[in-house]
Amino acid sequence: MDDGCLDMTKAFHVGCRGSVKSKDMLIEDTEQGWTTIDLDLFTDIGPVEAARRIKRQIGDTPTIVSVDMDVLEPGECPGVGFIEAGGMTSRELFRFLRALRGLDVIGGEVSDIKLAVVLDNFEMEAFPLTLNMSDK
């Protein structure tokens, strides 16, 4: 961001909720230029509308999608790094990702999983995210 490698007019945080470690975290996001669709707004407008808003703003810009698994309700994804109640369901996340199809996705990541906890179930958590984004 500081080097100008990321166009902050096309950078989103989706699904933020609950407590933060400090008020500075929210201020930093705003100062850096992130567009935030918090979980309350996401719930109100739904996953398809959230994706539509993002696609409208991103357009045909090459895109990287990063899914931080602690956006999910802890019961939906055991082994997340930051456990906090009130997250998305896996159904909502998958629907949101399917609605993002058509973006020029050139890379991505799935983060914040404690592999020691979920190693036996990794295919149940990370791999479906990729499939839901794919047009193939």
Protein language model regions, located:
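Conserved alpha-helical scaffold segments that buttress catalytic/binding sites
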Residues: 1-136
